[in-house]
């Protein structure tokens, strides 16, 4: 299977990047005009925390995307080190099914870990900076909704890697674009309904499901489902494959998280100091 990037893929990529960046800018005037200063501050505090949560996925998406590309290009065996040679025109669907099992396992654990941290350490931090959840109405409930939205955003993230790795660049960008447009429409509509900051939190919670649905429909074609339907994957195969992938991913993961913490730790200290 040959993977080609066309001009349409590039154009859709630009559209996707624009809306990923512009979605916050488009919603911002409505947030500033319809929310109190305390709610605006709380919203940006959650966004700051959300940037750290996104680091949980910073190394895994490229890793899964790269290895999915190997598999759909005909690679029959994955290696920890060395050059992987493509010695076949046939896709090893058993290994593809194993990779899907690894992706689900990894992202399930990452998202659950992030949710636990948000509901424990994150809740303590928010309690401190909101003066015991009193500065903003329903602050605790808003934080729980935000934590759940972060959970689903991380859990569904591997679909982007699957589409990219299988050469469906345009389709991946369409899914991302649809999700961001849904976020914009939901945020503005719910703000006009008078839900306040809950509007943004609910939009963040609901919009990823649209992206996930579209991504699923694009990646899991009937042909792919027919090929992997009868594959029996053992837990040992999933663990062994993960060890191969983790060998190089851990280095990038530690480096990225360390760099981010060094550059942005001051924001969290400022939040505690100014609370």
Language-model region placement:
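Interhelical loop/hinge segments that connect adjacent transmembrane helices in multipass membrane
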Residues: 1-6, 215-264
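Signature of the first transmembrane helix
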Residues: 5-74, 250-272
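Residue-level recognition of pore/gate-forming positions within transmembrane alpha-helices
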Residues: 17, 21, 48-51, 150, ...
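Membrane-embedded alpha-helical segments of multi-pass transporters/permeases
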Residues: 25, 29, 55-59, 115-123, ...
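Hydrophobic alpha-helical transmembrane segments
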Residues: 144, 174-230
């Amino acid at each position: 299977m040959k993977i080609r990037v066309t001009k349409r893929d590039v154009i859709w990529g630009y559209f996707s990047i624009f809306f990923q960046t512009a979605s916050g800018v488009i919603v911002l005037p409505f947030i500033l005009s319809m929310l109190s200063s305390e709610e605006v501050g709380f919203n940006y505090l959650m966004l700051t925390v959300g940037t750290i949560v996104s680091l949980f996925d910073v190394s895994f998406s490229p890793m899964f995307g790269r290895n999915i590309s190997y598999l759909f290009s005909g690679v029959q065996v994955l290696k920890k080190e060395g050059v992987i040679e493509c010695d076949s025109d046939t896709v090893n669907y058993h290994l593809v099914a194993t990779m899907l099992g690894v992706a689900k396992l990894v992202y399930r654990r990452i998202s659950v870990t992030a949710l636990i941290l948000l509901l424990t350490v994150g809740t303590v931090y928010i309690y401190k900076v909101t003066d015991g959840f009193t500065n903003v109405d329903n602050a605790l409930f808003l934080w729980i909704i935000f934590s759940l939205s972060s959970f689903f955003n991380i859990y569904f993230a591997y679909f982007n890697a699957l589409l990219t790795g299988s050469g469906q660049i345009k389709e991946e960008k369409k899914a991302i674009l649809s999700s961001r447009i849904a976020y914009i429409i939901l945020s503005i509509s719910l703000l006009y309904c008078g839900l306040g900051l809950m509007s943004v939190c609910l939009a963040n919670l609901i919009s990823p499901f649209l992206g996930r649905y579209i991504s699923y429909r694009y990646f899991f074609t009937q042909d792919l489902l027919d090929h992997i339907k009868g594959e029996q994957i053992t837990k040992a195969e999933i663990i062994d494959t993960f060890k191969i992938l983790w060998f190089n991913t851990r280095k990038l993961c530690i480096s990225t998280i360390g760099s981010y913490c060094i550059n942005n730790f001051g924001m969290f200290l400022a939040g505690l100091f100014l609370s």
